[in-house]
Amino acid sequence: MNILVVKTPEELAEVGYKLIEEVVKTKENPTLGMATGSSPLGIYAEMRKNKLDTSRVTTVNLDEYVNLPHEDKNSYHYFMQEQLFDHLPFKQTYVPNGMASDLEEECKRYEGILAANPVDLQILGIGENGHIGFNEPGTPFNSPTNIVELTESTRQANLRFFEKEEDVPTHAITMGIGSIMKAKQVLLVAMGAKKAEAVKELLQGEYSEECPATVLQRHPNVTVIADQEALSLCSEAIADEHRQVFTISDLLSDSRVGETAN
């Protein structure tokens, strides 16, 4: 597991973009696993700013709310259109359909899409309780795409995007932890003190379904980009022989960003 230490959201965005750019430029027909929320916003802005050639790129999104129309500004369909799909010409884009009449069938359909489009790089944020995607504590590590009931803590964390609490959806479709782990490479981004406990569990905690992010301890190719606040509860042991810690000056001055993905 590689840990890339940054000071600002702008640095996180630039380093994250370079990792994505490397995949897009070196793979013939790359597939990117996309996340939503505030964590990847800067990275998506860099993709727009740099006019990344996405004409060969297929995207698959992690999740979508259930019963939230695609045109709703808080749906992840809307989010992706606003952030990327209306700005860059992708080969193909997929987002789970939370409006499907048969949600179980939609989960199976989406698993088929993932099987046909193996993910080269999966972007992840991390929840304060360690969730990845909408996979809450207690989710089996081998879970496929599934329907989940959102915990109260997750709904409260997402309340800032909605006008009132009752507008926050109670359920979502999410790629399962087993689905996420099939990605060839994972890029997890974390900023701020609110993520510190979850990041500590990810890097130093016990491998346990009680903290979904700890599954990444067993993934062969994970890069974590985090600031000092997000790393504030971690011991210096994170710089042991299993992990590499770089600073922004290391990363942007040479080719080491690409090397962390190998």
Swiss-Prot record:
Catalytic activity line of the entry: alpha-D-glucosamine 6-phosphate + H2O = beta-D-fructose 6-phosphate + NH4(+)
Position of the signal peptide: none
Family annotation (Gene3D superfamilies): 3.40.50.1360
HAMAP family reported in the protein's UniProt record: GlcN6P_deamin
Enzyme class: hydrolase
Molecular function via GO: glucosamine-6-phosphate deaminase activity; identical protein binding
Entry-linked PROSITE patterns: GLC_GALNAC_ISOMERASE
EC annotation from Swiss-Prot or TrEMBL: 3.5.99.6
GO biological process terms, semicolon-separated: carbohydrate metabolic process; glucosamine catabolic process; N-acetylglucosamine catabolic process; N-acetylneuraminate catabolic process
Active site per the UniProt annotation: D63, N129, H131, E136
Gene Ontology CC: cytoplasm
Pfam families in UniProt: Glucosamine_iso
Protein name: Glucosamine-6-phosphate deaminase
Species assigned in the record: Bacillus cereus (strain G9842)
Swiss-Prot/TrEMBL keywords: Carbohydrate metabolism, Hydrolase
Function of the molecule: Catalyzes the reversible isomerization-deamination of glucosamine 6-phosphate (GlcN6P) to form fructose 6-phosphate (Fru6P) and ammonium ion.
Family (UniProt): Belongs to the glucosamine/galactosamine-6-phosphate isomerase family. NagB subfamily.
Pathway annotation: Amino-sugar metabolism; N-acetylneuraminate degradation; D-fructose 6-phosphate from N-acetylneuraminate: step 5/5
Domain of life: Bacteria
